[in-house]
Amino acid sequence: MNDPSLLGYPNVGPQQQQQQQQQQHAGLLGKGTPNALQQQLHMNQLTGIPPPGLMNNSDVHTSSNNNSRQLLDQLANGNANMLNMNMDNNNNNNNNNNNNNNNGGGSGVMMNASTAAVNSIGMVPTVGTPVNINVNASNPLLHPHLDDPSLLNNPIWKLQLHLAAVSAQSLGQPNIYARQNAMKKYLATQQAQQAQQQAQQQAQQQVPGPFGPGPQAAPPALQPTDFQQSHIAEASKSLVDCTKQALMEMADTLTDSKTAKKQQPTGDSTPSGTATNSAVSTPLTPKIELFANGKDEANQALLQHKKLSQYSIDEDDDIENRMVMPKDSKYDDQLWHALDLSNLQIFNISANIFKYDFLTRLYLNGNSLTELPAEIKNLSNLRVLDLSHNRLTSLPAELGSCFQLKYFYFFDNMVTTLPWEFGNLCNLQFLGVEGNPLEKQFLKILTEKSVTGLIFYLRDNRPEIPLPHERRFIEINTDGEPQREYDSLQQSTEHLATDLAKRTFTVLSYNTLCQHYATPKMYRYTPSWALSWDYRRNKLKEQILSYDSDLLCLQEVESKTFEEYWVPLLDKHGYTGIFHAKARAKTMHSKDSKKVDGCCIFFKRDQFKLITKDAMDFSGAWMKHKKFQRTEDYLNRAMNKDNVALFLKLQHIPSGDTIWAVTTHLHWDPKFNDVKTFQVGVLLDHLETLLKEETSHNFRQDIKKFPVLICGDFNSYINSAVYELINTGRVQIHQEGNGRDFGYMSEKNFSHNLALKSSYNCIGELPFTNFTPSFTDVIDYIWFSTHALRVRGLLGEVDPEYVSKFIGFPNDKFPSDHIPLLARFEFMKTNTGSKKV
């Protein structure tokens, strides 16, 4: 019953037993029983009672399941005994703890001086630290600073050693993170009570009674002193807390050294004894990582704000999630987001854990795990993962899918290499590798360029992932059902009947990702060479020309790129193009306006003839509308958006039928979904006006029967108000537009008289059209008039197995974060108003 291993602590090895006997003879330890030893190590030396979350002596004889009850009892009973502390006894116990710590083995590194306060609380590693750590303590393969002492002067490796030592202190404490969190809540409660009592005391002193000042307030309940609180606060610091603090200090040191270097008079040389680590990057920002020797013109206030937000885990992430996840689900719907299974001697992990995809923190340190299941990829919301002090020999490549990881520790394992997929961990702030026989190449990059440089190396040098096959083309029959699949669009065209070929045409819609938006900061998961505009532009050319589509509707095309690249290129392949830039180009100088993106339509000259064209920006067009009203929502939310639409009336040469082709790109921000609905309402209203003008000579022709295509990036889900409006003809009640007033548009429920349907609806839409780490969904569509056109073929999905190996596009095969949509349409024989060319 006295064996500490029964409490979840490692057994005391022969070496430790011999050390204990020597210490007993020297008077450094009390009675040599493991029970007495446990009491000395885990009792609060300040007060005689353990802090919240730490095991007391009575727990040795009780079930380990009583830990939670013991924690609640301590929190409920308060702190009445805090004043009964004996400072002399505290100092003696501190000395005992330090002796135990020095003789108890460890991770092969020295504990820093700041751990003295932690030791006084009892948060020290047990004497019975696993034997394998002692065996490897002097192994230079696991601790490279033993082989290369210069690493001890490297700030990045010093941080590794410091945090490895902090991690080693948690050994022997089951659920250490949960216990530390309980201590934080305990301190917060105590501080709140103190503040409340002080406020009440001041209020009673200030309010006079009928016979002068009121009676003196009763003395507050016994509270821990500031000295005691500071020690408990130090003990409650988790490994993550220490990491944040250390990273902040490193950032401050780097900033101070740069400032001092700038202020140094010209001609003064740096003393030889002073190290200027200007070439040593820190995990601050990609800019600092890649351009460590460049000029730093950042404002100090902005830098501080960036530092504060970069190292936090939940506060800023909640805001980010709300920005990119406009669905009904909320981050706070889940009451807990952390799972602490630390120091429980677990050998295997239940598969059910990986169903908890809401987890942001997972603590598996101090166990006996030999492998981590590939299902870890399901936990894509993880910010913190601690695998330290296990028996892992490798890390799964699937862990690279946890792209939101900020703090990842695997101290003291037997991992020799890192998967290339770790290049996806673009948000990583710290990677704890000390105590592993890691490849020297990776260690060299880590110590020279920090974790960011290591991640970028893995990202940029990842071996090519072959695409098993191109996207297949799905043939659709006259009933709107999939009939057959072809390996390519060209193969499908070869099997197309001659009479059907005369009545059909193909259209491609593609958001090409403007080069001004494809920044390294926004797409950190994309290899730098694959993100370069020269590479992406060449891949876009190959992709677009390979489909040989009759109509090309492109979004996010820069004005200059349209004029100098796409027009000359596509002209050689028989295309004519029309372009319309976003509205802000009108207010800019000619040179700057060339950098503004917009929408364009290219058509094959042997397939189509241009009859007329029109273009609009939604805000400007609505202000000219005869029923325009200056509502508050329009002025504050919609008027400053510069999105546009382009309209072309074309005649299909083989069949003689006419068609309106429209392309647009709606506003992106999910916080303005009501504005997107308004923009679509304006687009459809304008299109109806154009159709009525064209058919004014023929009152019998219904505008529903006029062939219409509307292609583009609508930035809207299938369950959005935009989709409902286009698909059903109106939006009566939808949460995205509730309470918003856009005047006439809102009064008529944004209704229109066209019969439109999504072309991909016949196959249930694609799995996604936009693929990024934080967002993967369908937001691009090709809408067609159901009374005049019929879908006869669709370009299918990207191979799912290939997609599963990435966290987002662009990459070496797909040059945009969107994928192109392609459909074949047939003019229906019921279409009227046709005229042979």
UniProtKB/Swiss-Prot annotation:
Example GO biological process term? nuclear-transcribed mRNA poly(A) tail shortening
- Which residues are recorded as modified (Phosphothreonine)? T33, T285
Q: Which PROSITE patterns match?
A: LRR (PS51450)
User: Any idea which residues bear Phosphoserine here?
Assistant: S278
Q: Which residues participate in Mg(2+) binding? A: E556
| The keyword RNA-binding belongs to this UniProt entry's keyword annotation | yes
Q: Where is the composition biased (Polar residues)?
A: 55-66
What are its E.C. numbers? 3.1.13.4
Instruction: List the record's Gene Ontology CC terms alphabetically.
Output: CCR4-NOT core complex; Cdc73/Paf1 complex; cytoplasm; P-body
Spans annotated as Disordered: 1-32, 46-66, 81-107, 197-223, 254-281
Which Pfam families does the annotation name?
A: Exo_endo_phos, LRR_8
- Give the record's keywords alphabetically: Activator, Cytoplasm, Exonuclease, Hydrolase, Leucine-rich repeat, Magnesium, Metal-binding, Nuclease, Nucleus, Phosphoprotein, Repeat, Repressor, RNA-binding, Transcription, Transcription regulation
What name goes with this protein? CCR4-Not complex 3'-5'-exoribonuclease subunit Ccr4
* Protein source organism: Saccharomyces cerevisiae (strain ATCC 204508 / S288c)
Q: What is the lineage of its organism?
A: Eukaryota, Fungi, Dikarya, Ascomycota, Saccharomycotina
